[in-house]
Amino acid sequence: MAQATDVLVVGGGLIGCGLAWRLRRKGSSVILVEASDINAGASGQNAGSLHFQLEHRFLEQDDASIRQAAPIVALSRLAVEDWRGLEAELHADLEVEMNGGLMVAETAEQITLLEKKQAREADFGLKTHLLDGDEARRIAPYLSGSILAAGHLPEEGHASPRAIAPALARAAVAEGADIMTHTRVVSVAKAAGGFRVGVQAPGGPLEVIQASCVVLAAGIGTGRLAEQFNLHLPLFAAPLTLTATERAAPFMPHLIQHVARRLSMKQTHSGNILIGGGWPSRFAQRADGGLNLQARPILDPDALIANLTIAAEVAPTVANLSVIRTWTGATTVTSDQLPLVGPVSRTPGVYVATGGSGFTLGPTFSRLLADLICGDQEAAQALAIVSPDRFGHLNSFMG
């Protein structure tokens, strides 16, 4: 006999666990299935940045792309408030620090890019402050003399990727959600009032879940899952690299980013400096030549050296610290770099939540999706910029 639920969530990362928790608080029944462990994917492998300013990856594109991406700032404004209240809501220490962020520039051309970014952010209500180099060093004396300007946002910061999804999962279970780990979706069929989804643990029996709606929030696995619902989604796995230094006495309270170079940097509660910013690693290859998305990506030493070099140029103190760990992981991006969150109109009852910014915007995405699933159309307006329907044309031949 099939288990019946209002919502089946596929994926045990920050968004999936947050959604299960929010839905249970609204009274919906929820089953969450995760192919591995809770927080095993990008939600637990990222650098924990709360980057509400427009990111470098948007700014390195042409002006049209920047204009297209700028409306995501409206979601960033909502995320500021969601992060401020999350620890209190969960009664958990998530190591949330919102001491401000600085996006630095080292040339006149980069300052122009900062000014352009600031104008786009202001259009959507995000008030960043443009500081000259001396002003930036007064609040961040660890910055190099090469820094000529910085965009300052007092609300930016960081949190612990290792703590948040597990805390959300515990809260969801406490509210009555059913979480099944090491369980994969193996079959999907439309049924009256929703979907019949077959799930299975290794060596276990096939279990059938009857769900009114299904949310695909499985990170790099979301595209393959969507195919089981007869959908194409323009999702691409991106292998990335992060590095941690030895512990140091507190000296870097801010999130540091660069307007024109790949860099994110912050000091954790334990004193380590986490260094990233979108530097690539490499996927292993399967025997047939395809990408092996199940294996941990392979470190690219050249990318690592370049990342650490930029970090030391921006904050010279970092050059005196030993690297103790470097790791790789994979996130998911879309063809236009914006996340993919919301309902899929051509297949009523299917929702998607993936495609980047899943840590910074994850609590907001899960809250808005829960509201939307429960009938709040204002949430649909807030999510319009990241709607999957912007790629609806890809499914015009899917029947």
Model-found features: residue ranges?
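Dinucleotide-binding Rossmann-like beta1-alpha1 core, especially the glycine-rich loop
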Residues: 49-135
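C-terminal catalytic lobe of FAD-dependent flavoproteins
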Residues: 309-399
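Central helical "cap/lid" subdomain
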Residues: 40, 207-254
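Active-site lid/adjacent beta-loop-alpha segment flanking the redox-cofactor pocket in flavoenzymes
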Residues: 250-347
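N-terminal Rossmann-like FAD-binding beta1-loop-alpha1 element of flavoenzymes
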Residues: 7-32
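Helix-loop-beta segment of a Rossmann-like dinucleotide-binding subdomain
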Residues: 92-103, 117, 124, 128-175, ...
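Helical element adjacent to the flavin cofactor pocket in flavoenzyme catalytic cores
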Residues: 151-212
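Glycine-rich FAD pyrophosphate-binding loop
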Residues: 25-46
